[in-house]
Amino acid sequence: DSTIAGAIVARKLKIYLIHIEAGMRSYNKDMPEEINRLMTDHISDLLLCSTQDSVDKLKQENIKENVHYVGNLQLELLKYVCDTYNDKSILSENNLTENNFALMTIHREYNTNEKMLKKIFLELQKIDTDVVFPIHPRTKNIIESNNINIPKKLKLIKPVDYLNMTILERTCKFIITDSGGVQPEAWFLSKKCIIMRSETEWIEPLKNNNNILYDYKTSLCKFIQNFLKVQIDEVNINCNVSENIFNKLLV
């Protein structure tokens, strides 16, 4: 919301307006971010795009001037942090070991209401892998006020800062998220990523088969197993299905 507020003020006061990460589209107008980015793109003087796909989407909206593909500043920052920061105390503080847990971040309204949280948590009960969930206070209040059962393997921790988040991303086995920012970070770090959304702005990680949109129909446990394409004993996921089904899956 601060993005569109600042953009409107700049436009009204005739201040030169540059939109970084322009052209991102989910085409889901129920997302507040989608409305903000659409409006900001159409009133900006200079549009700096993180992906070529964003440039193409702006062309479809007849925004062709002062549009530049400059690359992803978020990934430049992540690379810098990976090169300069390696304090893994967040792992010991939460009794975690490298490559032995999944990282989950969900915060969007359609995933954090009582009904959906119960459904997601019910599915997580079938996963025989620790799932670390840095939880937003609003989501925590929903869980507590509705007495939602927390699966044994789900470890709720307090929200973490950016540096510690990169450590969790770098040391986890795979990621479950509905975050926009985590998706390209997972791709950059070669961490398989299950996106708890029906659409996404980040197309490249999908095309490269690093990330996948959850279909909200298949059992989450089975969906993860099929996506990772590894033997059942390697990912420690118990889906209560015949072991023969997984014998031919490639590591």
Annotated model-derived regions:
Residues N86-T171:
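Donor-nucleotide binding loops and adjacent catalytic segments primarily
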Residues D53, I212-V251:
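Leloir-type glycosyltransferase catalytic cores
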Residues C49, Y69, P134, I176-T177:
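Short beta-strand scaffold positions
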Residues T40-T112:
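A nucleotide-sugar donor-handling region in carbohydrate enzymes
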Residues D1-N62:
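Active-site and donor-binding regions of nucleotide-sugar-utilizing enzymes
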Residues C49, H68-Y69, K155-P159, N211-K217:
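Short acidic-hydrophobic, aromatic-tinged amphipathic segments that line or gate anion-handling sites
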Residues H19-I20, L47, L168-P205:
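A donor-sugar binding/catalytic signature common to diverse glycosyltransferases
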